[in-house]
Amino acid sequence: MVMTDPIADMLTRIRNANIARHETVEIPASNMKRAIAMIMLKEGFIKSVEEIDDGKGGILKLTLKYGPNKERVISGLKRISKPGLRVYARHDELPRVLGGLGIAIISTSKGIMTDKEARKAGVGGEVICYIW
């Protein structure tokens, strides 16, 4: 079956595993999903990213992060730019998620980066999702 929005599927898998307090979640791999996972790792939302070769496109195995009493580190994930309605923002219009407590992931001409990095680089782009 062809997936119409693989990024939304990735975010939904992470959200569901997080709510169920699973240790890991497996996601079909792609370059964009890999870049999003690496940003989540760098920003401290997940513990680790592992690539598994399944003979097809590969699988990303994300280890989710929880606090000392099993409280969730990821409070929420929201897809912003969808296949039916793309959302773009200039560098001076990039959104701040929860006043800077969360991150927006932006697809720019210089690659996929957080809203803070895009503001610093002075580039705008497609607002992929919010994570807080």
Swiss-Prot record:
Q: Name one Pfam family in it.
A: Ribosomal_S8
Q: Which UniProt keywords apply?
A: Ribonucleoprotein, Ribosomal protein, RNA-binding, rRNA-binding
Family annotation (Gene3D superfamilies)? 3.30.1370.30, 3.30.1490.10
* Gene Ontology cellular-component annotations: ribonucleoprotein complex; ribosome
GO MF terms held by the record: rRNA binding; structural constituent of ribosome
Function recorded in the entry: One of the primary rRNA binding proteins, it binds directly to 16S rRNA central domain where it helps coordinate assembly of the platform of the 30S subunit.
Q: How does it assemble?
A: Part of the 30S ribosomal subunit. Contacts proteins S5 and S12.
Protein name per its UniProtKB record:
Small ribosomal subunit protein uS8
